[in-house]
UniProtKB/Swiss-Prot annotation:
Keywords: Isomerase, tRNA processing. This is tRNA pseudouridine synthase A. InterPro entries: PsdUridine_synth_cat_dom_sf (IPR020103), PsdUridine_synth_TruA (IPR001406), PsdUridine_synth_TruA_a/b_dom (IPR020097), PsdUridine_synth_TruA_C (IPR020095), TruA/RsuA/RluB/E/F_N (IPR020094). CDD domains: PseudoU_synth_EcTruA. Substrate binds at residue 119. It comes from the Bacteria. The active site is at residue 60. GO terms for biological process: tRNA pseudouridine synthesis. Formation of pseudouridine at positions 38, 39 and 40 in the anticodon stem and loop of transfer RNAs. It comes from Synechocystis sp. (strain ATCC 27184 / PCC 6803 / Kazusa).
Amino acid sequence: MHSSPSAGKQRVALVMQYLGTHFHGWQRQPNFSSIQEEVELAIAKVVGQPVTLHGAGRTDAGVHAAAQVAHFDDPVGQIPPHRWSKILNGHLPQDIIVRGSAAVDSHWHARFSALWRRYRYSIYTDQWPNLFADQFSWHYYRFPLQEKTIQAAMEPLLGKHHLAAFHRAGSARRHSWVEVQGVECYRRGPMVYLEIQANGFLYGMVRLLVGMLAEVGSGQRSLTDFNDIWVNQRRDLVKYAAPAKGLCLLRVGYENFPLPDSLWFDSQPLWQFTG
């Protein structure tokens, strides 16, 4: 599957982390700073010409990534693919790092070769504010959250469903089918974590879903109401999205990915707080 390093055009895969706080999302757009543009500029400084970077997931403004996967075509091919990570880190701002890089076949694509993506949403439930938790979580404390209730609400989402109720306007996607492969809600001290794995995600889906699950977990909305809303695609009853800062792209799944599993953060939360 993987090409051997040689002079000439070479496709390179990257595993990246970033803090999304000061960026207007992954995707390049005029007049706004984006992750894609920052990394493309760094690559261009090295190869001396513009390149296009393709990401596995188009995270929104303010959303973080523990392991975003991307690829680009090195037009020169003189740099060994495994060295690109260290080279790029010398040209990137401090809130973006490349953890690893490797050669991939010319047909491999960071987005279209992905089998699934996994997101984690973090909620800080202690009444006392925490400066460090505030950067990466939603401070939700006025109503107690019951993680078992949230888990019970999430489990019927498993499988392939129309999830139009959790699809923000403005997306070019023509359908709302999503195959949800895994869901989990658990607590670590004052932190409540919601994880969801799917073959793909609708625009704004996780944040809209978490916003409603917080209502269910705090007793403001019943499980029956929640099920009726998503089954009947009642987007008009989904009132608000959870803040972007609590969301993190955790991992992307591929067949025979060339970089080691140690680059992924899928077993424990990245940030834990005791209050």
